[in-house]
Regions:
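Boundary/entry segment of secreted carbohydrate-active catalytic domains
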Residues: 24-60, 176-180, 285-292
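Hydrophobic faces of well-ordered beta-strands that scaffold small-molecule active sites
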Residues: 34-40, 65-67, 92-95, 133-135, ...
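Aromatic-lined carbohydrate-recognition surfaces of secreted/lumenal glycan-active proteins
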Residues: 39-41, 93-100, 156-193, 238-249
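Substrate-binding cleft of extracellular glycoside hydrolase catalytic domains
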Residues: 45-46, 70-155, 262-266
Length: 298
């Protein structure tokens, strides 16, 4: 049975009433039950400034942190942080993964990660333990994706299926990042056939859709590009989280909220939640990533 460990907290979602002319004011139009998550990649910097990151996470009303594991840091550093975070209602997931995990050295890297987590969990008190595993593999960035797609997909599925077994042995939920376009990636192999996106949603306990667009509705907006994943999540009882980008991007002006600012991002997320309330609403919103989020203009 899948472990459903998504914590839903009351977060004020700002909608903005954009009037005409000068003097337009923003105001709260609605309150919705939704949790906020974020990725923390610069682990060493923040683990040496734990009071600062906890204060900022609370300011942003974050309830789930995906913390990349830096094994150069002592386990005691993580124990202290997680205990303080949990006391503030913040769950911490162990984050790792890389495109080369589907390559020849991937199995060894994955084993090393889970061995570290296993040893850590065994030594940590309940209030110091990770709340889940969060994988960000991005197999499409590995060199074999273009010249041997079928083999790459099969190796990726092995990574995810093994991670599911390893996570459940630790009694932890497995969360997986996938891009929104995985719904259109077909596969046919020993794992069956169908959409790769649907397969991941079936295998993982939680899935974050990297829906990197800076508008909620209209054509090619967040709501439209995540429609299939949200529907599959409802059918398969897998919580679907929607991820948005705050890093500057050279892939197009429609990708990131970096230039638009935090107020505009919250406005669009409010529109997304309003549109999705009737059917297949996301379980949570994830902001990528913590450092770039902090650097956004208001």
């Amino acid at each position: 049975m899948k472990s459903k460990c998504v914590l839903i907290f009351l977060v004020v979602v700002w909608l903005f009433n954009m009037g005409k002319g000068i003097g337009c004011e923003s105001k709260v139009n609605a309150e919705m039950n939704i949790s906020l998550s974020t990725w923390v990649w610069d682990t060493k910097k923040w683990m040496l400034n734990q009071e600062a990151i906890l204060e900022k996470l609370q300011e942003k009303k974050v309830t789930n942190v995906y913390l990349q594991i830096d094994t150069d840091l002592l386990p005691s550093v993580y124990r202290h942080f997680i205990q303080q975070a949990q006391a503030k209602g913040i769950s911490v997931y162990a984050l790792d993964g890389a495109p080369y995990w589907i390559g020849p050295s991937g199995i060894e890297e994955q084993e090393a990660f889970f061995n570290w987590i296993t040893a850590y969990q065994a030594e940590a008190d309940d209030q110091q333990q990770f709340s889940g595993i969060h994988l960000d593999v991005e197999p499409y960035l590995y060199k074999s994706w273009e010249n041997n797609r079928a083999k790459s997909i099969l190796h990726y599925q092995y990574v995810i299926s093994q991670a599911a077994v390893q996570s459940h042995e630790l009694h932890l939920p497995l969360a997986v990042d996938i891009p929104f376009w995985f719904d259109g990636v077909p596969f046919k192999n020993s794992n069956g056939s169908g959409s790769l996106g649907q397969w991941v949603i079936q295998y993982a306990d939680e899935v974050t859709i990297m829906a990197y667009r800076n508008h909620a509705d209209k054509e090619n907006g967040i709501a439209e590009i995540t429609e299939n994943e949200r529907r599959w999540g409802r059918v398969l009882s897998t919580p679907i989280e929607i991820g948005v980008e705050t890093m500057a991007s050279d892939e197009g002006e429609y990708i990131s909220f970096s230039a638009k600012g935090e107020e505009k991002m919250m406005q669009e997320l409010g529109m997304l939640l309003t549109e999705c309330q009737a059917e297949n609403s996301p379980s949570s919103i994830a902001v990528h990533h913590f450092d770039s989020w902090l650097q956004m203009k208001p």
